[in-house]
């Protein structure tokens, strides 16, 4: 009986080790969009993001769940070979989302090795490929999975902090 328990524990340990190895490899190998921290405080930071090539889908969705599911599925299909060249494109971070009452978008930053000419052409005509404008963004973090409620609370906290520090903002918010 104790030998069987030991075997189960060893098997669970091996599964855990393989999972952790896979996640570590995925997290460390995922290309991240380059940015420069301009100002860092305890509860927020201001970053400068240079232009980047993006694949974007637009949506009429006005909540996180609807925009995330429809946008992610379309973009994932594109990078997993749903393009004219049938080429897989590496996933990058962060995934960008903009949610407003007038419409929303989700964007994947394309790996640095691509430009407008070398990036595979999406099969889905609703995927727009373009360069983002360089921008300064104020960033606040929150833990766990994103929900509309968590996003609203984080946004209000960031607006309050920036207002108290007399930092003038322009435009809406994005999820990174």
Regions found by a protein language model. Name each.
Residues 2-176:
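A solvent-exposed interaction/effector surface
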């Amino acid at each position: 009986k104790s030998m069987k328990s030991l075997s189960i524990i060893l098997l669970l340990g091996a599964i855990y080790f393989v999972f952790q190895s896979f996640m570590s490899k995925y997290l460390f190998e995922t290309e991240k969009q380059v940015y420069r921290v301009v100002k860092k405080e305890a509860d927020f930071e201001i970053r400068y993001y240079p232009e980047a090539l993006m694949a974007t889908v637009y949506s009429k969705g006005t909540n996180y769940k609807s925009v995330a599911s429809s946008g992610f599925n379309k973009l994932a299909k594109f990078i997993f070979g749903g393009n004219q060249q049938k080429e897989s494109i590496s996933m990058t971070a962060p995934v960008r989302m903009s949610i407003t009452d007038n419409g929303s978008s989700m964007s994947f930053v394309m790996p640095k090795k691509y430009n407008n000419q070398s990036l595979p052409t999406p099969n889905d005509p609703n995927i727009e490929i373009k360069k983002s404008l360089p921008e300064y963004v104020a960033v606040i973090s929150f833990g766990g999975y994103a929900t509309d409620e968590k996003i609203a609370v984080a946004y209000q906290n960031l607006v309050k902090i920036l207002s108290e520090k007399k930092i003038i903002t322009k435009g809406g918010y994005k999820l990174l």
